[in-house]
Structure formats: C-alpha cells, structure tokens
Amino acid sequence: MRKICLAAPLLALSLQAAEPSIPDPLWDGHESVAAYAQRAHLDATKTFDLGNGVKLEFVLIPAGRFIMGTPEPAKPEITVLSAQVSIGIGATLSLIMLSYLLLRKRTGRRFSFSLRWLMAFSLACSVMVWGGTRWYSALVQIREYEAGLDWYNAMNDDEKPAHPVLITKAFYMGKYVGTQEQYQAVIGTNPSQFKWPQNPVESVSWFDATAFCKKLSEQLRASAWKAQLPSEAQWEYACRAGTRTIFHSGNADSDLDAVAWYGLNSGGKPHPVGGKKANSFGLYDMNGNVMQWCQDPYRPYESLNAAGTSSDVQGDRRVLRGGSYTWYSKACRSTNRGANPPDTRLTNLGFRIVLVQDK
C-alpha cells in the first residue's frame, strides 16, 4: 500500500521515511489538478460522509517543487547609469532637432534635404526612440526592484531565507477549513464563539485539532485513510498553488478581497467557508477567515542543518498559517508565519486537515 510522505526541501528539509516509498510524478506547474490526477492515476477529489448530511471534501494536491519563504528580489540587469546615458542621448537629440526647427522658423530659410541629411535625420529619430525606450525600461525595472526590496526588508525575519522544497508525494487537503458542523459530527461539541454550522470551527487549540484528527481517523479506518494536520511546507505549497505573488490571487488588496475574509471586508467576524474564490488547486479560505494550525513545532528557517533537523525549537509552540478575519491585508500573505503554544484558543484560530494513507 502506498503512503503519503510529508513535504521535504531539496537541500535542507529532508524527512526520513520509515520505509522506502516511490515518489509520485511531479506537477509541471501548469496542468490542471484533473490532468495531473489522470497522469498520476489518482483521484482528483475525495468525499466522506459524516452522517446527517455533513460531508468532508478533499482535493488532490500534486507532488512538486516550490520556493518556500520570502525570496529576495533579483537585481535588474539594467543599471541606473545606463538609464542616465539613455536619457542623455534622447535629450541631446531632442535639443538638436528643436534648435533646427527654431532656426528655420526665425531665419525663414528653407533647407534642402539631401539623401545624406535624410539618412542622418532617420538615424537621429531611431536613436531617440532607442534612448527613450531604454530609459523607460530602466526606470520601470529600477522602481520594481526598489519596491520589491522595500517589501522584502519589511517582511518578518522568520520568513527568510527562502529555500527550495520538494513535495515528494501527492496528498489530499480539505477543500475548506474545518467547519462547526463537521467538528460537532466528530467530537460532539462546538467550542466556537461565532456559532453557525458552515462557519469555521474556532476557539480550538492544537490539542483539540489533533484530537479531532485522531477520532476522525478511527471513523475512516475502513477506508484505509487517516487524518492529520498538514506540515508547514505542505500548507504553503498548497496555498501558493504554483504562484509567487504576495497572495495566491495576486499582489494588490483587491486581489485579496476576491479570495479572503480579512480586516477590511469581514465586519469583524468569520464567515461561512467557501464564500470567496478558491485557488487553482481548488482550496478555499487559505489567505483569510481563520488562521490554521499546522503539525510542526516552530523552527526558524535558518536553523535547519544539512540533514533537515534542528535543535532550535522555539519552546513547544506550534506553527500557525493563513490569514484571519481580524488582520490587515499584508498579514494575510502566503508566506506569513505564526506560532502559539498548543493549548491556545482564539476566536480567529481554526484548522484544516490532510489525508494520508493508513499503514
């Protein structure tokens, strides 16, 4: 029976498997989940009935590579000096042409243009266009780099350094963050403060979330699947869905508004799951609504050694990912990391589960 492994970086986040497993084919970054599922001979979705009309829906997350964390922007190839040279060329030629036209107007003389003059004039126009284009291109690249550098410097240090990660096995992730009706169906209680069946379950600790996974796994035993919280790498990979932008939907606040409930559009409360647009993997509420517990203890990225292990665990805190209905927009970015003690319960904190094959 195949098993699904946790995500592992190419260089630094390798996880030792209990026994050898065959990697799944890697996603090419462009094909649809349905096309990948067909190529990998896997189901694109899975659904489990919890009774009384309550269902758990999962979507396939392909195996693949991505850059985890906030990368430093690449310096533009064109320099400020080349931009200044281009400006100088364009301005000089413009001045020459303007002087010629003014001289002609003042003297009233008509100049006869020979073929040589015509060629020189054409060359001057070409150089002017070239200079202006180079100047504009340089200006755009320089401004984009400066904006990217300002953004990079403003990010939390624990999102750096960016590092390559390899997801060796495809896995299934909850299409929605866990809901109150799902929690009620499995655990029998509902600790949420903002009660509504389709709202995210909130005010749950990491211990509560793992207890939910354990009990759900008992119910799923006959299906050969078990539930658990995602690793941090699995979560970010699934959230990004092949993107490199601030949010999986883009870089602007308007892009976030289309996919997430956050501080400026939530009205100070969580909302029913699936009310905004999904990412390209088919996952909802990854950048907003409620934060989500991950399996991992918190570790700074720079503390990882070549074997992918670290003794620098920040107490017993567990990783939190995702946006929140209480947060400003930039805090909902795909790379943002949080961590709290595992017994923390907050009204903007829930969880999402993944499925792995039971041994």
Which residues make up each language-model segment?
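Juxtamembrane/start-of-transmembrane alpha-helix segments at the extracytoplasmic/lumenal side
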Residues: I78-I89
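Internal/C-terminal transmembrane anchor helices
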Residues: F111, L115-R134
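N-terminal pre-domain segments of enzymes
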Residues: A18-G51
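Short, well-ordered surface patches within globular domains
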Residues: F66, Q180, W196-D257, W293, ...
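Surface-exposed recognition segments
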Residues: E19, L149-L166, T243-R244, S266-K269, ...
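Hydrophobic h-region of N-terminal signal peptides that target proteins for export
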Residues: A8-A17, S126-M128
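A short glycine-rich, aromatic-capped structural motif
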Residues: F48-I78, S137-S192, V204-F207, N287-G288, ...
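Alpha-helical transmembrane segments
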Residues: A91-R106
